[in-house]
Regions:
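Intrinsically disordered, low-complexity segments enriched in serine/proline and basic residues
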Residues: 1-3, 7-13
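Residue-identity detector for glycine
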Residues: 4, 21, 34-37
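Bacterial N-terminal signal peptides that target proteins for export
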Residues: 10-24
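Bacterial N-terminal signal peptides
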Residues: 23-33
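Phosphate/dinucleotide-binding and metal-coordinating scaffold of catalytic cores
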Residues: 38-415
Length: 415
């Protein structure tokens, strides 16, 4: 440790004043820094703990956030957790179908107003209102399952959220997919990160040479200010190859631009979980980020937003596989087809082993059960919560056998 400094959470070093002539305010600051040093982001995302998180927002600003909940306007706020208070952070509404004026879905950006400010090493934090999921567990359990299958996935935990000391109910604390996340889970985090945004149903087809079609769908999440040719040229080149490469050379031409093994693995996990709004979603591709390392043209997927999984226990593993340009051609490649079936089998065995998927549901339920019943702003009743929980547990028990049967049939060449 550097003399005259304190090592805070996530190894951030903050210079300290001289011990001579310390004021009460300085002592309070030192105490808060000590608290921060004792905590890390792993503590915040502890899946077995129900956190208490408090936001303090000017009452007039809060009223505007509720009245204009469809807008992305930032407002100043303080965030407090376990005695650590982050001042002058920025908060705004977030979400698509989950946006509502009652139980706000929120994004907190710690550096928006204060350059370089971090909370437990993080630039931002998502507060998911769990509005459309009566179980409040689909995303949390799904992200844990992605991680169990070796995929980079945002960490999640639960909290009771208070705004101006008024309980808002149960929320998920969600790690934001940003360069900090990438550096923790994939590589050095110096590459190009893009968030897919829904404009119109999109199935992976080539959108032409003009970059505007890609720019409208893939929002920049790193390297702000770099020219469009640098940001979007490689994305255009990838989709061109996907659509125009011949069948005999398709895999060899596309794989240097898109990690096809990782792509197929991602889709297989979604299909096992009966995801209705993912890569093979009902309205086209949805809920993913693209990441490209700084020294490479090869893209990969990052999973986000999994609150529509567990859709139907009998969801076919071939559901909509012929609609997506990328996956349709991947499934025609013998190596990738074999990989798809193998990952589905791996999912089924991981879900069944020691009650793996059901055990994760039990783990999440133990954290939130009582708090959900006391949630004053949730959309669904406690009976609906119980029914959704029972449905998830039935899915966890039955899904592995159904998928293993599908895989065995497909390996025999049967439809």
């Amino acid at each position: 440790m550097i003399a005259g400094s304190v090592l805070t959470a996530e190894s951030a070093v903050i210079p300290l004043p001289s011990m001579r002539g310390l004021t009460f305010a300085m002592l309070s600051w030192l105490f808060a820094a000590g608290l921060a040093g004792a905590q890390t982001s792993a503590d915040l995302f502890d899946p077995d703990t129900l956190q208490d998180v408090r936001l303090f927002i000017n009452s007039r600003d809060l009223q505007q956030m509720r009245e204009r909940f469809t807008e992305d306007t930032f407002f100043a706020a303080d965030l407090e957790w376990r005695g650590i208070r982050v001042r002058n952070a920025a908060v705004r509404n977030k979400g698509l179908a989950t946006r509502n004026p009652t139980k706000l879905g929120l994004r907190v950006d710690f550096a928006h107003y204060t350059a370089g400010q971090r909370f437990l090493g993080m630039r931002s934090l998502l507060l998911d209102n769990l509005w459309t999921d009566p179980s409040m567990m689909r995303e949390r359990v799904s992200m844990a399952f992605f991680a169990r299958l070796g995929q980079a996935a945002p960490r999640e935990s639960y909290c009771r959220l208070f705004i101006n000391n008024v309980l808002q109910g149960v929320y998920a604390l969600v790690e934001d997919v940003d360069p900090t996340f990438v550096s923790r889970s994939i590589d050095d985090g110096l590459g190009y990160l893009h968030e897919y945004r829904f404009v119109a149903p999109y199935f992976g087809e080539f959108l032409g040479e003009d970059l505007e079609g890609y720019k409208s769908r893939f929002a920049v999440r790193s390297h702000d200010g770099e020219p469009d040719s640098t940001q979007y040229g490689p994305i255009r080149d990838m989709f061109r190859a996907i659509s125009q490469a011949g069948a005999a050379t398709w895999e060899s031409e596309v794989d240097p631009l898109l990690d096809l093994s990782q792509f197929v693995t991602h889709v297989a996990i979604e299909q096992f979980l009966a995801e209705n709004d993912g890569i093979l979603g009902a309205a086209g591709m949805a809920n993913f980020y693209l990441y490209r390392p700084s020294n490479s043209a090869r893209h990969r997927l990052i999973v986000v937003d999994k609150d529509t999984t567990f859709f139907d226990v009998r969801f076919s593993v071939l559901t909509r596989t012929d609609e997506n340009v990328i996956f349709r051609q991947a499934l025609a490649a013998p190596r990738l087809r074999a990989l798809y079936l193998q990952v589905l089998e791996d999912c089924a065995r991981a879900a069944a082993a020691d009650g793996g998927l059901d055990a994760e549901i039990t783990r999440a339920l133990a954290v939130i059960d009582a708090a959900v019943r006391e949630d004053p702003l949730k959309q669904f009743s406690n009976d609906a919560f119980d029914q959704a929980t029972a449905s998830m547990r039935a899915f966890a028990r039955e899904r592995p056998g159904i998928v293993l049967s599908d895989v065995a049939r497909l390996r025999l060449g049967q439809p």
